[in-house]
């Protein structure tokens, strides 16, 4: 069994907009141009956790304390962030306008059938939507 998590579900907080804002402030670039930089950061974020952000952006943990809370439980293994999969599928999933529909791209990137993976999200509405689209999905709580 492979577990798929979306980025905000990993930290149980809307992390993506906060990270993009930090990147914009640090680089002076408009948000629109930061998508590739954020995508490039994902493997480190997955491997090292949110602490990597403090190293890159001193003061981030003070500005966004909820994104840096220690997890009460470990993640199930093996897990993949939906946006952290091999290009082009992972790249497309990151930019997909409908996050749940990006699960098909994630499964394609991993070469998995829907029954071989479980999507975990902290948002019950997205879990219900994923199930309605034929994916195995459960609510994940820290």
Indicate where each model-derived feature is located.
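N-terminal helical cap/lid subdomain that shapes the substrate entry/recognition surface
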Residues: 2-71
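Short beta-strand segments
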Residues: 13, 80-84, 121
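Short alpha-helical
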Residues: 18, 101, 124-125
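Short glycine/serine/threonine/alanine-rich loop segments
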Residues: 29, 77, 112, 135
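Substrate-recognition element of Asp-dependent hydrolases with the DxDx(T/V) motif
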Residues: 54-58, 62-96
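Substrate-recognition "cap/lid" segment bordering the active-site pocket of phosphatases
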Residues: 82-116
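Acidic, Mg2+-coordinating phosphoryl-transfer loop and its flanking beta/alpha structural elements
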Residues: 114-142
């Amino acid at each position: 069994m492979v577990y798929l998590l979306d980025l905000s579900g990993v930290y149980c907080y809307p992390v993506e907009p906060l990270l993009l804002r930090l990147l914009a402030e640090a680089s002076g670039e408009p948000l629109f141009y930061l998508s590739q930089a954020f995508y490039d950061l994902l493997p480190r974020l997955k491997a090292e956790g949110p602490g990597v952000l403090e190293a890159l952006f001193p003061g981030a943990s003070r500005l966004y304390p909820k994104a840096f809370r220690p997890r009460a439980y470990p993640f199930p293994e093996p897990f993949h962030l939906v946006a952290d999969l091999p290009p082009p599928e992972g790249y497309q999933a990151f930019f997909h306008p409908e996050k749940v529909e990006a699960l098909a791209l994630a499964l394609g990137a991993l070469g998995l059938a829907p029954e071989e993976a479980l999507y975990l999200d902290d948002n019950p509405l997205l879990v219900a939507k994923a199930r309605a689209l034929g994916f195995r999905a459960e609510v994940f709580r820290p």
